[in-house]
Amino acid sequence: MSQPSLYRGDLVSAFPAAVTTAGVGTSYALTSIPGQFTKKVTWSYSFTTAPSAIVINLEASLDGVNFFQYDTYNTPGTIANRSVDVGQNNFVRLNVISLTLGSGAGIGGNIGY
């Protein structure tokens, strides 16, 4: 399965809808820029009601199959806005490892390049 491409200046939703359980978001292919040897992405998550517990990872991959953790966030009640160098990896995604929410709550995530 091919991943959608992420171009310099793009900001995309990491999840197709508000997330209420742990799970992997959409993976995106990072487009290459001539002369660029490392790639920097930004990522964030937001919420309608603050989760009481959360662990969310930014993961990157060379091949789009084998993903590795590059950043993690686990501070409930605050909104994450992070910037991470993912080296020469070609793909990125967000992965919600664990999440505890109140009734009717959900979180969203974004990735920028």
What are these language model-derived features?
Residues 1-14, 107-113:
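Short, intrinsically disordered N-terminal pre-domain segments
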Residues 15-36, 49-53, 74-82, 100-104:
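Surface-exposed ligand/attachment interfaces on beta-rich extracellular proteins
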Residues 59-61:
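Conserved Ser/Thr-centered positions that define the repeating blades of beta-propeller domains
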Residues 38, 51, 64-66:
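Short, solvent-exposed loop/turn segments that connect beta-strands within catalytic domains
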Residues 39-45, 86-105:
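Noncatalytic modules at the cell exterior or secretory-pathway interfaces
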Residues 13-17, 64-72:
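Surface-exposed loop/edge segments in extracytoplasmic proteins
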